[in-house]
């Protein structure tokens, strides 16, 4: 608990009945609240570029997602991990995409997606917690920074951010104007409960205003009608995964004229120590959900023309070892892969200073060697897309990074 919250609770002790009523009030705001359609300070205006960051937590196997099938050492280095249930989706003579990434492959073909391979952080150890802290903070060592690079970037651009989560992730922390949104697990409040809250809040202008705003936002939400539809009236077909649902909602928020300029989504489950060779195993299933979510994001933004002004960056905290382990999975590594997509991306290509897969070419004889600093990718996107000055990128967004030159990955 936040110490300030503890002080407030101690100062205003609550009876059980009062606690229940405040719990009910939380249910109202949780189930009513949605992204505002009115103009907000810091909100992006019509025609403003949008940025989406997708964090794959757990350490994506870059050679599984984007296999280097043309590398002469690929088959021997990967063993059973180099065999796929369906042919990999070839991108160029050296690289392909996992057969689960059908939509992403189509975007590469349409020159709306690019693959950055052998990419990674300055951090070279294999701890999830430390690597994710470096990934999100933008530092070179774990815990040297307590705010996030995207939060600092939004301060520099004066823009609003959104986390599709119940809390603000480290990458967005700082002094930026950031909201959060996540699907409510609570039922919609009854009319009687809302009426009781209105009476209780009548003497408190701030609470009364907040309740009315939540009700209005719920009514204005792009998906309010769909959310309220009975189960029997929902679209046919299997229930979409959580990432697909969040991607659709993110697209709606970003497409609004006064929506956020940047949004962050997360997917867990990429720590694939076992069962990677299974066509329905964790890697293949995760990539399918990622692929469907990215397609949903594109479809939602394309409808209003916002896709042409959007850049999506997909990253993970580290890659995995090149060789298979004893449980047909992979262990923590270093070098990995990042994906860029969107109408603003100069796609149709693989960006890689390829180090090779022979044992002597690997980092510590185990991992894909990092030849591209992930900060170069991020600095290129932030500079070209959000128009953040080089001096801010070098000193504030990614401190002491002047030697890391930005990659030009977006359309001119």
Regions found by a protein language model. Give the residues of each.
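Feature for exported/extracytoplasmic and membrane-associated proteins, marking the mature portion
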Residues: 2-51, 55-304, 323, 337-340, ...
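Short, conserved beta-strand edge motifs with alternating hydrophobic and charged residues
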Residues: 263-266, 311-315
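Conserved H-loop
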Residues: 307
């Amino acid at each position: 608990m936040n110490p300030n919250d503890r002080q407030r609770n101690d100062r205003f002790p609550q009876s059980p009945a009062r606690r229940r009523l405040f719990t009910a009030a939380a249910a109202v705001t949780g189930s009513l609240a949605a992204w505002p359609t009115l103009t907000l300070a810091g909100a992006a205006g019509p025609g403003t570029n949008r940025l989406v960051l997708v964090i794959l937590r757990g350490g994506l196997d870059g050679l599984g997602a984007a296999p280097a099938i043309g590398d002469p050492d690929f088959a021997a280095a990967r063993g059973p991990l180099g065999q796929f249930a369906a042919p990999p989706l070839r991108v160029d003579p050296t690289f392909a995409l996992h057969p689960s990434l059908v939509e992403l492959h189509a975007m590469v073909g349409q020159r709306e997606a690019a693959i950055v391979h052998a990419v990674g952080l300055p951090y070279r150890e294999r701890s999830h917690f430390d690597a994710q802290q470096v990934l999100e903070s933008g530092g070179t060592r774990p815990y040297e920074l307590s705010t996030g690079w995207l939060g600092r970037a939004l301060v520099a651009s004066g823009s609003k951010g959104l986390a599709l989560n119940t809390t603000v992730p480290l990458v967005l922390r700082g002094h930026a104007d950031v909201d959060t949104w996540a699907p409510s697990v609570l039922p919609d409040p009854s009319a009687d409960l809302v009426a009781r809250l209105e009476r209780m809040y009548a003497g408190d202008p701030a609470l009364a205003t907040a309740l009315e705003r939540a009700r209005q936002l719920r009514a204005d939400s792009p998906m309010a009608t769909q959310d309220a539809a009975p189960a029997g009236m929902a679209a046919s077909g299997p229930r979409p995964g959580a990432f697909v649902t969040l991607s659709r909602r993110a697209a709606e928020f970003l497409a609004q004229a006064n929506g956020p300029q940047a949004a962050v989504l997360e997917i867990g489950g990429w720590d694939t120590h076992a069962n990677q060779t299974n066509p329905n195993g964790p890697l293949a299933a995760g990539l399918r959900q990622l692929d469907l979510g990215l397609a949903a994001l594109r479809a939602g933004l394309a409808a209003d023309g916002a896709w042409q002004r959007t850049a999506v960056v997909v990253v993970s905290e580290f890659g995995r070892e090149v060789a298979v382990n004893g449980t047909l999975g992979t262990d923590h590594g270093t070098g990995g892969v990042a994906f860029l997509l969107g109408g603003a991306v100069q796609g149709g290509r693989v960006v890689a200073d390829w180090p090779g897969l022979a044992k002597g070419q690997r980092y510590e004889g185990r991992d894909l060697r990092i030849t591209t600093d992930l900060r170069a990718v991020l600095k290129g996107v932030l500079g070209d897309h959000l128009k953040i000055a080089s001096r801010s990128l070098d000193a504030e967004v990614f401190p002491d990074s002047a030697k890391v030159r930005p990659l030009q990955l977006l359309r001119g």
